[in-house]
């Protein structure tokens, strides 16, 4: 399987990247980035390469590079805290759909989008509405398969760290009791590894639901 990955430098994206590198059935990973960076996982060069572009609102200049890939994993996103709706929409809707249209034109069959628990196009919270609109647009875009991932709390594992110090402190504190918390709150807690493995599984084998909640993701 050949995978395109957006958001590889974020916490979730790092987890997805790691699972792709470790999976022997994944033969290639194309990371779409704004700036070239050093590989974060030991010697993945034979499998992982970067596509550098500074325009995430229009991929037409580089979309030929997407041809020949089977699935696109999209984990790029920002927190809505402190953002006005127009600004949040520009990042959450415009970039996501620009990427989706480009990979679809290139013949990519499967699109997997990391959304969030509580996403609802008719919800009261701004972020939930915007993400819900994004999900609906992706589901109606014409991919052979499209899956919306709605994890709750995602705990980083295997040395992966959040770029936000406060979040990382919370994750570090939770890690020793994670197995207990997952049994107590299966609908709300997953790990970066589970998200990555679930993405690979649904892209490879399909899944009966197009929208996967945390409990679905944690089952992989």
Predicted ranges, named:
Residues 32-39:
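Short, polar loop motifs at secondary-structure junctions
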Residues 7, 76, 112-115, 150-152:
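Active-site beta-alpha turn of Rossmann-fold NAD(P)-dependent dehydrogenases/reductases
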Residues 3, 31, 47-98, 102-105:
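NAD(P)H-binding glycine-rich loop region in Rossmannoid oxidoreductase-like domains
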Residues 22-25, 121-220:
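Oxidoreductase cofactor-interface core, primarily capturing Rossmann-like NAD(P)-dependent enzymes
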Residues 35, 86-133, 140, 144-149:
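Conserved Rossmann-fold NAD(P)-dependent oxidoreductase catalytic core, especially the SDR/UDP-sugar
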Residues 1-25:
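N-terminal Rossmann NAD(P)H-binding glycine-rich loop of SDR-like oxidoreductase domains
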